[in-house]
From Swiss-Prot:
The keyword Cytoplasm applies. The gene is midn-a. It comes from the Eukaryota. This is Midnolin-A. Residues 390-399 have a biased composition (Basic residues). Residues 206-219 have a biased composition (Polar residues). Residues 365-376 have a biased composition (Basic and acidic residues). It comes from Xenopus laevis (African clawed frog).
C-alpha cells in the first residue's frame, strides 16, 4: 500500500492564511469585492465597510442568506470565500437623528480612521485632525505626538509621570503651548505636592523629574486655523521661592490615570489652545509600557481631556495674570510699609511665591461663571434687539419716502371713541385742529374766485 505524500505544514498554514474575497451588494445597487482575513469577525467587517463607504458602523446591517449578522466570526456563520453579503443601510427620520450623543460622534470619527493614520499618529510621524459635531456645533481637534529618545541627561520634554502603583515610567501625553508674544503662559513643576507656577510673556518654563523615559507630547487645538503651535525651547531647573517645600516624596510623584489642564487661552471667538498633562491608563499600554496602536488609546486621551474640562473652571490667563500682579503689588507695598528697614531677599520673594501658588489654585465658583455667561447672553440679546429696531426704522423710512403723501412726524394721533351704535351720532371724533393732518410741501396760491363760500 503506497503512502500518499504528506503536505508540508508551511503549505497548510499558507492555505489557512489566504484571505477571503466577499461580494458586498447593497440595496441601492452598489457592488464591490472586499478581501478580509479568514478569522475576521462581523464587527471587523463592518468597520472595514464603514471606512470604505464613510458611513458610521452603527448604521450598517449585513445579511447572509436572509440572516442578519450581529456578532461572531465569519467562518462560524457559514461565510466562506466567494460568499455574497447584502448591505442594508439604516435610515433614521424625525427627531431620532438629532439625539446623537457626543461619545457617538467621537467614536464615529475614530472608526473612520485607517490603521495607517492611527499608527502614524501614535508613532509621532504625522498629526491627527478630527472633525467632531456635537448638536449644532462643529469642533476641530488636532493632536500631535512627538516621541523622544531615552537615556539622555536632559529631558527636552516637560513632564514625567509614573503609574499609580509602579516605579517605572509610563507613556505620557501632553499639549504644547501656543507660542504667541501677546499671551502669557503658565508653567508647572511636576514633582511636589504643591507645584509653583511662573509667568512668562513669550515662553513657558518647565522642570523635569529625576526619571528619564520615552515621552510623548500632544497638541490640542479647537478650531485652530492660523494658530502656530510649537514646543517651548527654554529649559530651566525647578526652584521654589519663599517657604515652599523643595523636596518631594516618591509617593507624590505617582499620579492616577487622567489629565489635568494647566493653562487655557482664548485667542479668538471659537479658537482655543491650552496645556494639559496626564498619564495613560494601564489598559492602553502593552507589556513593554508603550501605547497600544489602537483607536482606544486616542479615545482615552480625548476622554481624559473632556473629563478634565469639567474640573477646570479657571479664569482666562489674562485676567488671572492681572489679578496676580495686583495682589503681588499690594502685598509688596504692605510688606514695605510694615518693615521699611529690613529688605532681605526672603521677604521680597515670599509674596511672589505665595501669589504664584494662589494663581494656580484659584478657581471661581460655579455661580460666578453662570452669572458671567448670563451677562454675555443678555448683552447679545440686547444687541440683536437694537439691530432689529434699527432695521425697522430704516424700513419705515424707506416706505415713507415712496409714499405719495408726506405726513408730518409731529402730528398728534387721532383717536375715535364711539359706542356700539355709530349711526345714532353719539360717537365723536377727537381731532386737534391746531395742527392739520396733512400739509403739502408746496403752498398753493388760492384766489378769491376759486373759494366757495
Amino acid at each position: 500500500m503506497e503512502q500518499q505524500p504528506s503536505v508540508p505544514r508551511s503549505c497548510t498554514n499558507v492555505a489557512r492564511e489566504t484571505p477571503m474575497n466577499l461580494n458586498i451588494q447593497s440595496t441601492t445597487g452598489t457592488r464591490y469585492e472586499l478581501s478580509v482575513p479568514p478569522d475576521e469577525t462581523v464587527d471587523g467587517l463592518k468597520r472595514r465597510i464603514s471606512q470604505r463607504l464613510k458611513v458610521p458602523k452603527d448604521r450598517l446591517t449585513l445579511l447572509h442568506r436572509e440572516t442578519r449578522l450581529s456578532s461572531g466570526k465569519l467562518q462560524d456563520l457559514g461565510i466562506s470565500d466567494g460568499s455574497r453579503l447584502t448591505l442594508l443601510p439604516s435610515v433614521e427620520a424625525g427627531l431620532m437623528s438629532q439625539m446623537s450623543r457626543p461619545e457617538q460622534s467621537v467614536m464615529q470619527a475614530l472608526e473612520s480612521l485607517t490603521e495607517t493614520q492611527v499608527n502614524d499618529f501614535l508613532s509621532g510621524r504625522s498629526p491627527l485632525t478630527l472633525a467632531l459635531r456635537v448638536g449644532d456645533h462643529m469642533m476641530f481637534v488636532q493632536l500631535q505626538l512627538a516621541a523622544q529618545q531615552s537615556g539622555s541627561s536632559h529631558l527636552q520634554h516637560r513632564h514625567v509621570i509614573t503609574r499609580g502603583a509602579e516605579t517605572s515610567a509610563s507613556p505620557q501625553y501632553r499639549t504644547l503651548h501656543t507660542s504667541t508674544s501677546a499671551v502669557s503662559h503658565l508653567a508647572s513643576c511636576t514633582p511636589g505636592p504643591t507645584p509653583p507656577t511662573t509667568l512668562s510673556p513669550t515662553s513657558s518654563t518647565h522642570c523635569n523629574g529625576p526619571h528619564s523615559s520615552p515621552l510623548t507630547t500632544s497638541v490640542f487645538r479647537s478650531h485652530g486655523e492660523g494658530v502656530a503651535v510649537s514646543p517651548c525651547a527654554e529649559q530651566a531647573p525647578c526652584s521654589t521661592r519663599g517657604t515652599e517645600g523643595t523636596s518631594s516624596s516618591p509617593s507624590s510623584r505617582s499620579r492616577k490615570p487622567g489629565a489635568i489642564i494647566e493653562s487655557f487661552v482664548n485667542h479668538a471667538p471659537g479658537v482655543f489652545s491650552g496645556t494639559f498633562s496626564g498619564t495613560l491608563h494601564p489598559q492602553c499600554q502593552d507589556s513593554a509600557g508603550r501605547p497600544r496602536r489602537d483607536i482606544g488609546t486616542i479615545l482615552q486621551i480625548l476622554n481624559d481631556l473632556l473629563s478634565a474640562t469639567r474640573h477646570y473652571q479657571g479664569m482666562p490667563p489674562s485676567l488671572t495674570t492681572l489679578r496676580c500682579h495686583t495682589q503681588c503689588a499690594s502685598q509688596a507695598r504692605n510688606a514695605k510699609a510694615t518693615s521699611p528697614q529690613s529688605t532681605s531677599p526672603q521677604q521680597t520673594t515670599h509674596p511672589v511665591g505665595h501669589c504664584q501658588t494662589q494663581t494656580r489654585t484659584y478657581k471661581p465658583s460655579g455661580d460666578r461663571l453662570r452669572q458671567t455667561e448670563n451677562r454675555a447672553t443678555r448683552c447679545k440679546v440686547e444687541r440683536l434687539q437694537l439691530l432689529m429696531h434699527q432695521k425697522r426704522l430704516r424700513r419705515k423710512a424707506r416706505r415713507d419716502s415712496r409714499a405719495p403723501y408726506h405726513w408730518m412726524p409731529t402730528r398728534k394721533s387721532s383717536r375715535t371713541s364711539s359706542n356700539s351704535s355709530t349711526s345714532s351720532g353719539e360717537g365723536s371724533l377727537e381731532i386737534d385742529f391746531e395742527d392739520s393732518l396733512w400739509k403739502p410741501d408746496v403752498k398753493a396760491e388760492l384766489n378769491s374766485e376759486f373759494v366757495v363760500a
